[in-house]
């Protein structure tokens, strides 16, 4: 290259000369343009994979970024990453599974302890809040923690969430009254909001993309299994020790998890963290505090409206109407704010507008709805129709949970070996919808073979594609957005579950009340029968077999309506899959240090 008065910039060591030659070669190719003379062009700053502007004054430089820029334009590129392996990886995975175990257990373990809790605190009217307080904060803060994971140390954000969760569990364990228990549940939910998504984010930074699906499946399988064994464990603690151990159990498990991660988890520092020279106000604005303040009551309003409407209050009641109107106003405000905040939004709009990511979130939400509806209402069917205890009903749902776990693992292995994640997403709707569709044919005297077989078909289909939305997000987004993309998928799953469980609860309670009102010689009000609980039917009507049979038919029909809701959400999930771009994780590398 000849001197033109800028020889001080062009006479550089060999590596820089090689870099300029490579850029010149790229200029000769259609669609490529580079600027080596610093004439105002910004190309050097925008090349995929580069971290800073390259000039001759920088001395020897690595030519790899330019080579990669010529071959990859859609996805960042992964430098060689020293992922943990062997015993270290095993310990990290076990620690994450223990953390997820606590979160999932806490979601359902309280169910069988509620009767004893209400007896001790004399607070039957607070029953709904024992579960709702946990779910409300878990859903509402899910996206907020996604933002924290993007901006700060993943390891310490996760450990902070675990600490908050443990504090909440401790408050619940020592609660002297119902109000303290509800506060503890809300605090535990706040910590739980960052644990499940955080575990998946840590997996993303600890394993190569092509193997990530199988590890994600293992984490998700633990969540599903724990959700079912929760009531079993809660019943054992309540009967044999005290209900307070439903919460104390989280303390030693969380302690082991924290120690393991402190010593074995090491994620490189990321360049996406806030500038230390920023003012306090600038740092705070990175968290979108206004958006969070709007989003929290928005979620609370819709979940409360669905829980109260048609049961506690009529749909026309002013309180329910006000909640729905307020939800709509807050949602519109939140969405508008996300556009206005740009990159400082809780969820930058460009991420949601990425077709595969947005569609995967809808898919994950609908599948989460199907899963949680069945987790909650299958035990009710066994308790009301078959007279099973809480423990027995949990055992009877094992065919679904085991097959879901197997499906999760099979789906993860398939993606790891083939690289393609969309086939498993397409496999879910037909298999799962046939399974749950057959379950809507259940009658009071359905055979054991049918209720086992139909559960297996539904669970296997659900498991195959249940977590592929998370894989889709991680494969479709640059690693700097992995935390938010993962949190978005987890939020969709949790919120979809919470939303449609409330819808199913409305259908169930209304159908029971309506059906019981048509039963002759009931001897008590339909509401009184409903409030007594599904496990009390044999005690209430056991002396009159024909009346008991009639009441069980009413409960069977009501539960079937919840199964139909799961059938609808399962079928609708195929519409979301259509918009997910087919892709492979094979050979798709991600630059981990840039996150």
Curated annotation (Swiss-Prot):
Glycoprotein is among the record's keywords: yes
Composition bias, Basic and acidic residues: 1-11
Matches recorded under InterPro entries: MFS, MFS_dom, MFS_trans_sf
Region (Disordered): 1-62
Membrane topology of the entry: Multi-pass membrane protein
Keywords, sorted A to Z: Cell membrane, Glycoprotein, Membrane, Transmembrane, Transmembrane helix, Transport, Virulence
Function: MFS-type transporter; part of the gene cluster that mediates the biosynthesis of the phomopsins, a group of hexapeptide mycotoxins which infects lupins and causes lupinosis disease in livestock. PhomT is likely to be involved in the cellular export of phomopsins.
Identification of the protein by name: MFS-type transporter phomT
Organism: Diaporthe leptostromiformis
Chain's gene name: phomT
